Amino acid sequence: GVVVTNVGDSRAYHITEDGITRITKDHSLVESMVDRGDITAEEARRHHSRNLITRALGPDISADCDGYICPMNAGEYLLLCSDGLVNTVTDQEMLFEVIHGDGPDTCLDRLLAIAKRQGAPDNVTAVLMQKQ
């Protein structure tokens, strides 16, 4: 498997032929609102406070991080991405591009193009790995 640690609102996704699963949990105001049932996940995508994070890396080297173990089989993918991608590309678009793409580099190019077309800021970052 793969060990993933996160803080803030960058995400990790496990992608297989069967679907896409978000591994990490955002440390954000809207994620807390979704957890409490105040808003839906879809409403969170458009919420005016969606970029307010409750934890972040900064000058203080000690950060309260969450850790996850993701079992992975050969041929499966791990996508690490910033909120610039998450806020503009849907999970289903990510799944489609990764599964039907032509290798990790081409998939990332297509995902970044979709994000730009949907109005993403310049700070869209993503890494896609396929387990051999």
Locations of the language-model features?
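Conserved catalytic micro-motifs used in adenylation/nucleotidyl-transfer and phosphoryl/amide-
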Residues: 1-16, 22
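Structural motif
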Residues: 3-5, 21, 51, 77-79, ...
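A short local loop/turn or secondary-structure capping micro-motif enriched for an aromatic residue
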Residues: 11-14, 29-33, 88
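Short, glycine- and charge-enriched coil/turn segments that flank and shape catalytic ligand pockets
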Residues: 17-19, 37-47, 99-106
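Conserved, helical-rich catalytic subdomain that frames metal- and/or nucleotide-binding sites
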Residues: 25-74
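C-terminal catalytic subdomain
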Residues: 55-81, 85-132
